[in-house]
């Protein structure tokens, strides 16, 4: 499957919430209209063991399938076709780094605009 980044970028220009936030959700849970709900780590609740929290997150994330912005017709179709959930868009300022971390569940990262000197480390 090829992804048209220009179409995605054009649609993302319509999200006014990105003017004041560095990330917003593209998918949400039923009944939620807060574009920030779901950003950040879902592991912040420190009750139970890490294994229990990761198991809970794996279930919770699958509920994030409702399109947050109905006007993102092309972007929403890509998310649906790829079976993605809890998707979000992030904006990073120049000379800013994404912190080194381990995601507890599988992720797909699609850089829309980047610098040729940027890189991502992927290890098992």
Per-region residue spans from a language model:
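Non-heme Fe(II)/2-oxoglutarate
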Residues: 1-75
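Edge strands and adjacent loops of beta-rich recognition modules
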Residues: 75-90
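A short beta-strand-loop-beta hairpin characteristic of the jelly-roll/cupin
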Residues: 111-124
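A generic structural motif
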Residues: 95, 105-107, 115-117
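Sequence-level motif detector for i,i+2 pairs with an aromatic at +2
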Residues: 21, 84-87, 115
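Conserved short histidine dyad/triad with adjacent acidic residue
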Residues: 86-103
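A broad, low-specificity signal marking well-ordered, structured residues that form hydrophobic/aromatic
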Residues: 87-90, 108, 118
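Short glycine/proline-enriched turns and hinge-like loops at secondary-structure junctions
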Residues: 101-104, 121-123
């Amino acid at each position: 499957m090829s992804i048209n980044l220009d179409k995605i970028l054009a649609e993302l220009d319509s999200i006014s919430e990105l003017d004041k936030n560095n990330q917003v959700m593209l998918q949400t849970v039923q009944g939620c209209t807060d574009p920030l709900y779901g950003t950040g780590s879902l592991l912040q609740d420190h009750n139970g063991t890490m294994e229990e929290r990761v198991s809970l997150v794996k279930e919770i994330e699958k509920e994030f399938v409702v399109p947050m912005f109905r006007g993102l017709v092309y972007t929403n179709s890509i998310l649906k076709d790829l079976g993605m959930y809890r998707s979000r868009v992030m904006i990073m300022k120049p000379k800013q780094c994404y912190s080194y971390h381990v995601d507890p569940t599988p992720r797909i990262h699609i850089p829309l605009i980047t610098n040729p000197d940027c890189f991502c480390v992927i290890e098992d």
